[in-house]
């Protein structure tokens, strides 16, 4: 793995997960773990001592939201960059973690890479 950045992508849409994985790994420099909800995300949190970024859809199947997972991820990995995504323009953003980046679907690769970079900068201690 070397200097690859470790990214966790959480979405309940398999097509979105696959597209994001292809995009992030194809761009280079990213090692991607995909989770189709909170169970997969929690397993990834347990399995990896380090994550550079978490990208999570706000609305997930079940009771846990992407915001909940980002908050948990930040507690477990204090310097993780957080990117919250959603296609719903009216989604409730209450509880959005401090220093996270919001990105509205649909978005392009350049927007995603810029959001990850911005989230990582915001997550660094001052």
Describe the function of each predicted region:
Residues 1-8, 18-21, 108-126:
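Non-catalytic signal-transmission and effector/linker regions of two-component phosphorelay proteins
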Residues 36-37, 64-69:
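Acidic catalytic/metal-coordinating carboxylates
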Residues 105:
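A Lys-centered signature of the CheY-like receiver
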């Amino acid at each position: 793995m070397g200097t690859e950045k470790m990214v966790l992508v959480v979405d309940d849409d398999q097509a979105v997960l696959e597209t994001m994985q292809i995009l992030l790994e194809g761009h280079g420099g990213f090692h991607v773990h995909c989770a189709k909800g909170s169970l997969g995300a929690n397993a990834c949190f347990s399995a990896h001592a380090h994550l550079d970024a978490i990208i999570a859809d706000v609305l997930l199947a079940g009771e846990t939201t992407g915001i909940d997972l980002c908050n948990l991820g930040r507690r477990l990995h204090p310097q993780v960059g957080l990117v919250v995504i959603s296609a719903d323009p009216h989604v409730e953003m209450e509880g959005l973690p401090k220093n996270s980046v919001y990105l509205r679907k649909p978005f392009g690769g350049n927007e995603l890479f810029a959001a990850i970079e911005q989230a990582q900068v915001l997550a660094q201690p001052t």
